[in-house]
Amino acid sequence: MLPAEERPAVTHPRATSGDTVAEPNWDERLTISVGSRDAEIVGTNDRALQAAVDYVARLGGGTVRVLPGVYRLRNAVYLASSVRILGSGADSILMKEPSLKTKLAADSDWFDQEITLADAKGFAVGDGVCLRTKNPHNGGMEVAKRTLVARSGNRFKLDRALRQNFWEMGDSTCASLFPIFSGENIADVVIENITLDGNKDNNENLDGNYAGCVFLQDCNRITMRQVEARNYNGDGLSWQICHDVLVENCFSHDNTGLGMHPGSGSQRPVIRNNRSERNDIGIFFCWGVKFGLAEKNKIDGCRSSGVSIGHRDNNNLVCDNDILNSGKVGVLFRPERGKAFAPHRNRIENNRIVDSGPADGVAIDVQGETDAIVLSRNQIRESRQPMQRVGIRLGAQAGQVEMKENKIDGVSVAVADLRKS
């Protein structure tokens, strides 16, 4: 048997049952349009959009064209494999409706598929909801995202069982919170040329481990291109345990959480030519993000750090970015609980890092037992007064850090090496 590298190349493939690798390049694929008029599915809410996604997915994939208009969502649009969402840029706006919140009026056990609300006013069948409770054993927060599918008065059936106990003693609540686009266990999806608005002034917070303008979990080969993700009370774009995600030419701004959140376990993300502005953190590498690339992005005015790298985020390249006006730190290597948990073998190269933090701000801060880091050809500049500002700070526990050809201007201390000699 020939080794894989000598296998003959695939030419002129045919559509073959079960073959998800080699597919003919068809001249035309199924396309369904959604809009307020002159569309195959007429409507401007989540139900119309979901109907289009489900129709296209049932036939093996294709494109959902979102025509110009404002689409008001009472539930997430759940994506499906091999479906492309194609909007009309700034003219196609998916807007989250204001959130409601109430306590649960009766206990629900982990095997139950229903809840009882203390005040059901404003809640309706079809709504997406987020249930939260304190675990009675350890006090931790439990979260479940569900859809209301039937009701009798204040009692609502859920689309799935709870799988956690939601008891009154845990201060259990129900809120109409959800991502705008949601995807779990799907692959080969494109979201393109569309505007997503989280309506943060009228919604409570739901963090990026559960939601965002886009929230993805356990997915493969996802592309987000020319997506504007704004005003979410949480993250802009968040993907957890998702591999080979491409985010390019997107604009994530004015979210209360993270602009772009390559989440835990995500392998090989490519984040290119985007803008992340006025978020809490511009690009946040979560836990165990490896072999990623963040290049040619503009990260401006983020309240905490421009780029944050931490728990076992190894072998990533952050290069040719403009990281401007960060609230605390330009690029942060987070302190973790030991060397085995720290981020290693990452490269920060050829970035322009300008005006980082307050009077004691730091452009590049290497904390914890981070090791085998390369800081190369970065331009670090401070246009305000030097104050106590630092260009590059190496923490006391930092390991090997290679620094070469960095240009540092306008700070009080160019390099603060706190390691023991």
Question: Which residues does each PLM region occupy?
Answer:
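Extracellular "leader-to-stem" segments immediately downstream of a signal peptide or signal-anchor
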Residues: 1-193, 197-203, 413, 420-421
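Acidic, glycine- and Ser/Thr-rich low-complexity intrinsically disordered tracts
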Residues: 2-9, 371-372, 377, 383, ...
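Extended beta-solenoid/beta-helix repeat architectures
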Residues: 46-49, 54, 81, 208-209, ...
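Short glycine/acidic-rich loop motifs that flank beta-strands on beta-rich extracellular proteins
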Residues: 61-62, 73-76, 90, 95-97, ...
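The right-handed parallel beta-helix/beta-solenoid scaffold, focusing on the short coil/turn
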Residues: 62, 69, 75, 81-83, ...
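Right-handed parallel beta-helix
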Residues: 127-165, 185-277
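Surface-exposed loop/turn motifs in large extracellular/passenger domains
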Residues: 178-192, 213-225, 243-246, 264-270, ...
